[in-house]
Amino acid sequence: MFASSPDHFRPHDSLNLPTYIHISLMESEEQCDSINFPFSLRLDNPTLERIAVKKLKCIERGYAYPHIDIVFARGETSLLTNGLITSEKDQKTCGFYKSVQTISRNSTELQLLPDFETKTNLNGYVIFAYNTMEHMHTPKFTTSWKTWSGARMLSTRMPLPHIVTKMSFFKKVSGHLTFEYILIAKVKNMMVNAAPALNVLHYMKPKLCAYVGAYRKISFEVNRNLCRSLGLAEANYADALTNRFRVSYSNNTGYVEMSKFIEYRCKEEEEEARAAKEKLVKKSTHVQTEPTDTLRNIRKKLPRTLPSTPNTIRSPSTPPIFYPTYPSPNSIIGTIIEHKSEIVTVGNNYLLVLDNRNQAANVLSYTPRSEALQKAEKIFNDQMPSLPVEHKDIPQVFSRSPSNLYNSNNETPLLQNFQKLPEDDGSLLRHLKTKYFNSEEYTSAEFCKHMPK
């Protein structure tokens, strides 16, 4: 069985060429296809050999940096900002690091390992980020990185077929990131089954004072800004999606290597598709307060009408007519005399309620009431001949409903010829005071004064 040990690793670069990385730690969970590289590399150094670009995505959720952009440069180079528009937000998440040491396994040992790679790259990456004290940034502490960084534990604990094939340790040169050291370990066939590798990382986290995360490669966009930063002709590679992008430099000429599966995008078609989606009418949860075209075009419905019968037929344009009905004046006068009436209110209107149900049959045949009424009229007329009576004859008009215009019983109305009482202007009271008390100014106080005690 293959045994994992640090002795199986060897220095990766026999020529001792320096390696630099520009790393950008993205805190947003939303995936961005472009590479965050707001700088350009100096390409005039003859030792510059190769530049590689990778975009990594975290396997698990809930990590501080879900996405990481890395630009590898093998050879002497530096960062430039000439002709580039950068923002402070992009620069705060970036850092420039130089390789301290890179080790990898022997090729003969790697041939004994099972290879599950097919058309898709199944390798994974484990990234460690360390933040230490300033007084600990000594050359001795940096050279002993295999002891305190957890590199030995990772290489010995990782089970088959997940084998650590390459490890690179970097120290910070410039940038705004707070991490002083970064370790990148490449794990072969980690994406076949990531559970064993994740178990090892969860075992190591409490033992290390560092940020630990497992990542995999994803596709990214080779846009014009990236091509301009790497000194490439942007017309040949712009708007291409790939998961592998390498540039080899020789005699001031760059040769590009990309993965076999490349997807080219048309920006104009994407903008048209995005504009078409924005034009779609979305269902609104707000109340519609203004009239719209859809509301104006709604078919108007006719109002509901009664059945078309001879009694209820009516034109839709003719408003309904209401005929008020009133009781007969004979019943009103007779009821008022006998105090058989009652006034009730209905809303803002007054209604006179008459109860003639029990006396309807006796109205015409009841003679005592007629005799009493005649006697009262005679007494009243005897008292009035000597008094000047001034009154206005106001004809009585009673509105009657069409149903009461004709009485089918041909009944003779009571008190039809009854003389209308004159308006009381106080003359009758003055006449009584003069006749019985010899004074028109006679008051109730004088009456009480002469009353016998």
From Swiss-Prot:
InterPro entries: DUF7153. Pfam families: DUF7153. PANTHER family: FERM DOMAIN-CONTAINING PROTEIN, PROTEIN CBG14274. This is Uncharacterized protein C01C4.2. It comes from Caenorhabditis elegans.
